[in-house]
């Protein structure tokens, strides 16, 4: 297979949703139908002690939530698939935003009963701003929920994008038995079993007037389906690949990830429609995947994927050229040359050494602290710099200190490693050695930080909430003593040794900015 053929078969996408819409369960079922796993272990399956493959961190297994981005790779029907399962919890939206910088399309999971929710709306806007094509999977249709036409209206009213159902549920609300593929005009009836979604479902397929289909669902249901399809054909939008690519139209699919209903038809159609690796913008201009010079960027740092060794993995999206094990690259931010000798690919914590990888692929690099989120690696002869990632100012602050001074070394090591992941901001106070000030977007980030220090570094810590809600930086080298009106501010220093002013509220932050133009 030529390099160009390898690039064309890549599909790299993220799955986004509001918490509890079923994002991680859908990820798991795509792995099941893709042949990457043989039994799905949903976070709901407590009795059998199986957990989602993508939820690999211990706290995720205990709480049944995703707080990290997982990278999952497998082959299916000639495609090399890279799925990035993102944190569902709103407190970890920054990790999700960074992950979206590394994908070529996104799958938006919507709960049939709730429609478009707040977090979905935020993540949709990020995709829209970046021009990422969005595919919609309406989940949980084995439960009572909104009418499919109402969901189409909801997507347009809330998100401002038209939808084009690629399939349509067969049955009555809350009791759907199959889906109708509008392109092939085939009905797919799913035979329910008692396996609770851990195995593939048996499917009966046929035309709408086939005897086998009529006997399974009944003539009345099929008559209602015909009415819906007629209305769709008259009033709905036809599929338009150009509009999908521009983010003006979202292909829409129906199913239930928990029971495997509609998962395989979605996967196969998605791979047919989803974009190949796209061109990327750099400060020097646009680079194409087929360009021969190697380039990539770091979009995520993860400490302790192997807690026994306290390792640190930097996840890189390859953008151009061919990656080969042992390649020597320029680290654009430091100007140093780095040899990438231990590249890995992942199915959550399971790893495989990479000999070769192509644009669209996500690989993990063992890192000793040289790489950071947003960094560029490239060939020295063809230097490029990828555009900076968005930064989210923290809104909650706390003082973090070890319970025992005997654990100070482990404490410093743990805080340093976890801070490099980017979910928590760490600040130092002048002349204060025994504690740090930490900032986060949400409370759960504090809880996860505390949990991981205690369980991965064996350091019990104290977290003291502080009454600050805003952080501000100055432009240029202005010393704190020259600023007017910082009496209510706490002055701390970030990892680049820049002064940061923590303030009680946004009003005082605005007032400080006015007094110091």
Task: Describe every region a protein language model picked out.
Residues 1-517:
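Structural and coupling elements of P-loop NTPases
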């Amino acid at each position: 297979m030529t390099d160009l053929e390898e690039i064309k078969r890549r599909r790299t996408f993220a799955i986004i949703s509001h918490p509890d819409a079923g994002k991680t369960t859908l990820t798991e079922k795509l792995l099941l139908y893709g042949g990457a796993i043989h039994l799905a272990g949903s976070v709901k399956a407590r009795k059998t002690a199986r957990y989602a493959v993508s939820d690999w961190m211990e706290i995720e297994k205990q709480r049944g939530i995703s707080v990290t981005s997982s990278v999952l790779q497998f082959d299916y029907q000639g495609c090399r698939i890279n799925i990035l399962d993102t944190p569902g919890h709103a407190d970890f939206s920054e990790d999700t935003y960074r992950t979206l910088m590394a994908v070529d399309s996104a799958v938006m999971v919507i709960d049939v009963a709730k429609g478009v929710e707040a977090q979905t709306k935020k993540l949709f806007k990020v995709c829209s701003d970046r021009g990422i094509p969005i595919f919609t999977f309406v989940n949980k249709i084995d439960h009572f929920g909104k009418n499919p036409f109402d969901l189409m209206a909801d997507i347009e009213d809330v998100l401002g994008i038209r939808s084009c159902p690629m399939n349509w549920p067969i049955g009555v609300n809350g009791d759907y038995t199959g889906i109708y593929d509008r392109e092939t005009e085939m009905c797919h009836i799913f035979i329910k079993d008692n396996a609770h979604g851990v195995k593939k479902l048996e499917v009966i397929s046929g035309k709408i007037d086939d005897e086998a289909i009529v006997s399974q669902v009944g003539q009345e249901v099929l008559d209602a389906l015909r009415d819906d399809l007629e209305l769709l054909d008259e009033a709905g939008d036809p599929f338009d690949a150009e509009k999908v690519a521009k983010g003006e139209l979202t292909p829409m699919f129906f199913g239930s990830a928990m029971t495997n209903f509609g998962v395989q038809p979605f996967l196969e159609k998605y791979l047919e429609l989803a974009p190949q690796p796209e061109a990327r913008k750099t400060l020097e201009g646009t680079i194409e995947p087929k360009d021969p010079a190697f380039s990539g960027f770091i979009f995520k740092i993860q400490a302790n994927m192997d807690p026994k060794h306290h390792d640190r993995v930097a996840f890189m999206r390859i953008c151009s050229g061919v990656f080969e094990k042992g390649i020597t690259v320029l680290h654009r931010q430091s100007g140093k040359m780095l040899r990438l000798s231990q590249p890995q690919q992942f199915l959550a914590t399971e790893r495989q050494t990479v000999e070769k990888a192509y644009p669209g692929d996500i690989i993990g690099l063992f890192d000793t602290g040289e790489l950071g989120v947003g960094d560029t690696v490239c060939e020295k002869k063809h230097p490029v710099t990828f555009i900076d990632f968005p930064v989210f100012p923290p809104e909650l602050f706390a003082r973090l200190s070890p319970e025992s001074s005997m654990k100070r070394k482990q404490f410093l090591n743990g805080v340093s490693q976890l801070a490099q992941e980017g979910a928590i901001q760490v600040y130092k106070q002048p002349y204060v050695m025994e504690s740090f000030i930490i900032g986060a977007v949400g409370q759960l980030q504090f809880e996860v930080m505390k949990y991981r220090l205690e369980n991965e570094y064996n350091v019990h810590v104290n977290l003291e909430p502080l009454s600050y809600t805003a952080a501000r930086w100055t432009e240029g080298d202005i010393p704190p003593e020259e600023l007017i009106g910082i009496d209510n501010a706490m002055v701390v220093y970030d990892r680049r040794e820049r002064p940061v002013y923590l303030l009680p509220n946004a009003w005082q932050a605005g007032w400080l900015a006015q007094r110091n133009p």
